[in-house]
Amino acid sequence: MSIMDERLLSGESAYEDADLEYSLRPQTLRQYIGQDKAKHNLEVFIEAAKMREETLDHVLLYGPPGLGKTTLANIIANEMGVNVRTTSGPAIERPGDLAAVLTSLQPGDVLFIDEIHRLHRSIEEVLYPAMEDFCLDIVIGKGPSARSVRLDLPPFTLVGATTRAGALSAPLRDRFGVLSRLEYYTVDQLSAIVERTGEVFEVEINSLAALEIARRARGTPRIANRLLRRVRDFAQVRGNGTVTMEITQMALELLQVDKLGLDHIDHKLLLGIIEKFRGGPVGLETVSATIGEESHTIEDVYEPYLLQIGFLQRTPRGRIVTPLAYEHFGMEMPKV
């Protein structure tokens, strides 16, 4: 089992997050906290489409996991007053799977494809005419007698979500009219999300405690809500049910989440480079072997936050741990 599967601070959705995220999900752009640039642009595009009585242009949402791409896809459907059909790149294994989904759509519907970068190229080719001309080309028969039949589709909006925009093929990426990058959240935005989640949980939470959880949530709402859920457990068992600063600090220390939101895996990655490779540079595959995790997981899940806070650098020669990370661990950088 991947160590990411057990990770409290992973931005990836876990099984236990599904019901919680559904209950916490805002229904409108007005209720949605953060992502102001993307939100304001979507407000204009949605309003313009409604005024023209057209479907919204296809939308690509990209950025690190846990920032609200699925939530925004559902909000787009709500704001347009249409239904949303949800699937994912790995779930669409054959062109026929995609054809079945497309032909089931009603006029104006939103089709949300999560992890769209994982679509097979043969499936992408079926998607191109569907996105451009709202039609589906189906090949009937085999060999010399095979013929292509074109089926008309109702106008729809494709919303694609990806953590790896660079992995999308250029022809697919170019067919999206709206591209929105989701950024990490500020501490104040996350604190507001934690307090809103506390209201849904019907748990009293001190404003300082909400800020402390926000500071350690790695700029990610999914992580903030997950941390609050665990801190709430400590508040009920070790306290009087109120999430206080004291309970929060105790809980997060026991959960091995430090003051910058780094956990034992981040420590293992950074200290591994420091202690075994004198801070780098060291290649990604070597780091992968050192901590026992796949290289693409390190690149997509672990490294973005470490790069964001300036603890790690990617260079042509490999990964380098920065002076900031040495300072965080109370260590001196080796002299060259």
Curated annotation (Swiss-Prot):
Swiss-Prot/TrEMBL keywords: ATP-binding, Cytoplasm, DNA damage, DNA recombination, DNA repair, DNA-binding, Hydrolase, Nucleotide-binding
Binding residue positions for ATP: L24, R25, G66, K69, T70, T71, E132, D133, F134, R175, Y185, R222
Family: Belongs to the RuvB family.
Positions contributing to Mg(2+) binding: T70
GO CC term (a single one): cytoplasm
Region ranges (Small ATPAse domain (RuvB-S)): 186-256
A GO MF term: ATP binding
GO BP annotation list: DNA recombination; DNA repair
Signal peptide feature range: none
Residues at which DNA binds: R314, R319
Assembly and interaction partners: Homohexamer. Forms an RuvA(8)-RuvB(12)-Holliday junction (HJ) complex. HJ DNA is sandwiched between 2 RuvA tetramers; dsDNA enters through RuvA and exits via RuvB. An RuvB hexamer assembles on each DNA strand where it exits the tetramer. Each RuvB hexamer is contacted by two RuvA subunits (via domain III) on 2 adjacent RuvB subunits; this complex drives branch migration. In the full resolvosome a probable DNA-RuvA(4)-RuvB(12)-RuvC(2) complex forms which resolves the HJ.
Region (Large ATPase domain (RuvB-L)), start-end ranges: 4-185
Domain notes: Has 3 domains, the large (RuvB-L) and small ATPase (RuvB-S) domains and the C-terminal head (RuvB-H) domain. The head domain binds DNA, while the ATPase domains jointly bind ATP, ADP or are empty depending on the state of the subunit in the translocation cycle. During a single DNA translocation step the structure of each domain remains the same, but their relative positions change.
Catalytic activity: ATP + H2O = ADP + phosphate + H(+)
Listed CDD domains: AAA
UniProt region (Head domain (RuvB-H)), positions on chain: 259-336
Species per Swiss-Prot/TrEMBL record: Bacillus thuringiensis (strain Al Hakam)
Gene3D superfamilies: 1.10.8.60, P-loop containing nucleotide triphosphate hydrolases, Winged helix-like DNA-binding domain superfamily/Winged helix DNA-binding domain
Coiled-coil annotated spans: none
Top-level taxon in the UniProt lineage: Bacteria
SUPFAM superfamilies: P-loop containing nucleoside triphosphate hydrolases, Winged helix' DNA-binding domain
Function: The RuvA-RuvB-RuvC complex processes Holliday junction (HJ) DNA during genetic recombination and DNA repair, while the RuvA-RuvB complex plays an important role in the rescue of blocked DNA replication forks via replication fork reversal (RFR). RuvA specifically binds to HJ cruciform DNA, conferring on it an open structure. The RuvB hexamer acts as an ATP-dependent pump, pulling dsDNA into and through the RuvAB complex. RuvB forms 2 homohexamers on either side of HJ DNA bound by 1 or 2 RuvA tetramers; 4 subunits per hexamer contact DNA at a time.
Protein's gene: ruvB
Compartmental location: Cytoplasm
Name of the protein this chain belongs to: Holliday junction branch migration complex subunit RuvB
